[in-house]
Amino acid sequence: ARLVHLAGLCGRNVAISSATIPPDLAEGLYRSYQAGLKSYNSFFTGKKQCALVLCDEFRTDVEPMDSGADSAYRKIHDRFIRKRVENLGKEPVKRRGYIQFCGAEDNDTDAAKETSYFENIREAIEKLHENHHVIDKRTKKRISFGVVRVANITPCVKVSLYLMKCGWSEGTAVRVMTYHSRQILLLRHEQERYLDKVFTRKTQSATVDFQDETVRKHLDSTPEENIIFILVATPVEEVGRDHDFDWAVVEPSSYRSIIQLAGRVLR
């Protein structure tokens, strides 16, 4: 809010891009900007007027706003959101989610609960791979790329180790990568550059001719018919990445984290 107020105070424009910003927060930022712009206008004879721009993939609304018109902002924002919900309701459903039941008992040890939790993640991965894989054009193997999102770094590493060591169904092989913010910066830079290349996928075909050298090597050298590429990540995967996965397993921190990660599936 302070930064937005400062932008208004300097007579600059502000663009807010977010899939999950709550209406109250948006209104608070609008008020901060208007307060800054009001101070800016008090210094100059030529006044700047605030223009409200609301846009999504369906439409763009532009409204001139007077200083102090907070109630008008609320009405315009609500109208835009109602129209957006209406348009989304007409779109085909691209993503469906379900809750994976974790059957650990209260009297189990912490180690047993952790193992049960990780095993539920493994079961969910196999189920999602079965329903959302593609066929490699050259080998005819069933391939899927997915992400497992966990809330913190330590369990992120533990999940990765478990998925690499645990038993999988016959004919299934996995390749696991761990992605979190505690990685050495140089290695993280190279990792993100590679992930951006591999997961920026535009094809919608059920049969894919994979071209990446590393992926190709795994497909050609692995005898199993099902190959699952798994990225185990913390919330760093949710923001600022144009990645496209076939499926996701989410340990959510909030509804917003679910929405953010859903935007990385069938992008």
Where are these regions (language model features)?
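Conserved C-terminal RecA-like helicase domain
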Residues: 38, 100-231
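Conserved SF2 helicase motif VI
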Residues: 255-267
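Short glycine-/polar-rich loops that comprise or flank the Walker A/P-loop
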Residues: 10-13, 172-174, 244-246, 256
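Conserved nucleotide-binding/hydrolysis micro-motifs of P-loop NTPases
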Residues: 20-23, 152-155, 183-185, 237-239, ...
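Conserved interdomain linker/interface between the two RecA-like ATPase lobes of SF2 helicase motors
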Residues: 12-16, 21-30, 36-154
